[in-house]
């Protein structure tokens, strides 16, 4: 049997890779998951070859512009201050710094009506969570404009939350005065009622209407609204009362899981 030269053996050994091949497959992650904020706020559409294709797959018009939850989920994504989770901003409270001319300080307040302020950030829209952990104001010093000396930052958690609660109730009362009820009971309507028989916050009835139980916030509702829904359930058009429903859902989320 012929023998190979020593240098041939050496060449074969050194030419082999000592690194074990990886068995894992390289999976490309969708930019919708990794950089979702770049896509938020844009209306995305699905295109089919023809209208017949839409019917062929058994799809129907979901009327998402009439859907309160769909509209909230479609809002731009923002990072929550404490957890850094990226959440649609309609589920968060927007905070800004505002100058208090009287005391010459910067106050941290909830930005409810979109008034321009400094150092925008977002926190959970839930009172119980905020009572346990509020945002650290020491990190805000770099967010104010250059001043010599810089203005001190003041954040009164109790006053901030109380002011936010008052704004929510005031906005809800104003929207309720313009409420448009309907006699229809379908997937385009929302049923408002008060019941102690179940703990469900939201449900969908057999006719497709979204049902919202206001039992958990009866002590926060404006008197006229509470009296109306307590006497009998009311049905409202989802599309015509979107501002009211958005504020109501924000109020429900804020007081969810509170100690009663």
Curated annotation (Swiss-Prot):
- Compartments it resides in: Mitochondrion
Biological process, per Gene Ontology: mitochondrial genome maintenance
Query: Mind telling me which Pfam families this protein's record contains?
Result: RRG8
Record keywords, A-Z = Mitochondrion
One cellular component term (GO) for this entry is: mitochondrion
Where does it mainly reside?
Answer: mitochondrion
Q: Which family does it belong to?
A: Belongs to the RRG8 family.
Function in brief: Required for respiratory activity and maintenance and expression of the mitochondrial genome.
The protein's name? Required for respiratory growth protein 8, mitochondrial
């Amino acid at each position: 049997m012929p023998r190979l030269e020593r240098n041939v053996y050496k060449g074969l050994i050194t030419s082999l890779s000592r690194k074990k091949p990886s068995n894992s497959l390289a999976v490309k992650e969708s930019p919708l998951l990794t950089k979702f904020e770049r896509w938020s706020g844009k209306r995305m559409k699905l295109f089919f070859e023809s209208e017949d294709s839409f019917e062929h797959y058994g799809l129907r018009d979901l009327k998402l512009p009439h859907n309160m939850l769909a509209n909230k989920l479609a809002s731009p994504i923002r990072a929550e201050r404490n957890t850094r989770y990226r959440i649609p901003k309609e589920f968060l409270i927007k905070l800004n710094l505002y100058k208090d001319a009287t005391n010459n300080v910067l106050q941290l307040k909830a930005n409810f009506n979109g008034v321009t302020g400094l150092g925008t950030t977002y926190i959970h829209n839930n009172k119980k969570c905020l009572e346990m952990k509020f945002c650290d104001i020491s990190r805000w010093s770099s967010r104010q404009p250059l001043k010599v000396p810089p203005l001190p930052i003041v954040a009164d958690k109790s006053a901030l939350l109380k002011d936010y609660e008052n704004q929510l109730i005031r906005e809800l009362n104003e929207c309720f005065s313009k409420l448009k009820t309907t006699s229809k009971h379908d997937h385009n309507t929302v049923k408002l009622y008060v019941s102690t028989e179940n703990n469900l916050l939201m449900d969908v009835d057999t006719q497709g209407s979204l049902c919202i139980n206001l039992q958990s916030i009866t002590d926060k509702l404006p008197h006229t609204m509470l009296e109306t829904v307590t006497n009998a359930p009311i049905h409202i058009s989802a599309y015509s009362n979107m501002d009211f429903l958005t504020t109501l859902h924000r109020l429900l989320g804020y007081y969810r899981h509170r100690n009663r």
